[in-house]
Amino acid sequence: MAGVSPAVFGCPDVTLGRNTAVREVQENITSVDSLTLASSNTDFAFSLYKELVLKNPDENVVFSPFSICTALALLSLGAKSNTLKEILEGLKFNLTETPEPDIHQGFRYLLDLLSQPGNQVQISTGSALFIEKHLQILAEFKEKARALYQAEAFTADFQQPLEATKLINDYVSNHTQGKIKELISDLDKRTLMVLVNYIYFKGKWEMPFDPDDTCKSEFYLDENRSVKVPMMKINNLTTPYFRDEELSCTVVELKYTGNASAMFILPDQGKMQQVEASLQPETLRNWKDSLKPRLINELCLPKFSISTDYSLEHILPELGIRELFSTQADLSAITGTKDLRTSQVVHKAVLDVAETGTEAAAGTGYQNLQCCQGVIYSMKIYFDRPFLMIISDTNTHIALFMAKVSNPESDENFLNVEYAFPQVLEIMPEYRSVCTCCLPCLTRQ
């Protein structure tokens, strides 16, 4: 933290007018309610997922769509003209139906809801701006970032990259309970601003697995390959269940003790690509509407830890967000001039699933699940082949995390239960990558 001091809208000012603002949003959210934002969030999540899978079809995937959306929406406060339009439409908002101010008000409402203390489920999310000490930021941009996204602001000396890197990494580590310790490995001296968004999730299964029942078992990577992994087991579990015959997959929902749940999608052998191609907001709604409590005689789920790193500046253009990374970028609402562009967006996620619960940092994760199927004959569900996972907040219907488990053995650590996905934006001539959710970096053009 040495060499850095809080800026105008640092943490102590975050609550200024916040309660009144939240009440106003709660009373006036008509164009953008939680369901509208949830639908856009899900649409973006599935679109990004398909791009990630397209590049690495047989690898694990873990990311926090909500964290990435929040970071980009916050950055859009500083964008104008086509740059602004591309960001918001890339996040799957219909600007004809949903005006830009309503989008930001909706995020403010959701961020406040998620920050409320819950019953045994801890969700912590926040944003921070690290600004080059000589860079003049418009007061309007800083105030909107504080009021709408609860963003803290700090000055940093990017001419001393080691000190600036330590400042940012310490901030992220402190706010993700140490789950993400090195978001950034180095910083370019041309960096002018780094935007960080983090999300930390920790929950306990309503029906935890018994560690004594966990044993090594086969996980089939494909028709010809398998690995031995720790397999958790729970018997006689009643939980929401749906068999989707059209898409050839089984859907099970495992609930946490608070306002969160994990949905597991198990495609039939050889049907993963069919399910992935069908991922749409309507698909998720159909699954949720079709889930019914069923008795599952035996449910087996791998105990695992997986992690991923993504440079999103190479992927977001496929979703229509292009100008942000070019010399045509208009981020003049940040400084008053068109002298900034985004050089890099990095997303890092860690997901651990174990018997008792889930812990995540700026990302997604969940543990201990249970499910059931109401049928006359014995029902057994084995997650012994690649499957999908979606962790959602049940109050807002927001998809906090999404994952594809292709190989539970890809990481060595199977013991802890945690998820980490911070998001950072760095503003500089070339986008700088960071470890955790999403990191946009801004540099001078």
Curated annotation (Swiss-Prot):
MF terms in GO: serine-type endopeptidase inhibitor activity
Name a single GO biological process.
response to bacterium
CDD domains named among the record's database cross-references: serpinA3_A1AC
Q: Highest taxon of the source?
A: Eukaryota
Return the Pfam families for the record: Serpin
The similarity annotation says:
Belongs to the serpin family.
Its name, as the record gives it, is Serine protease inhibitor A3F
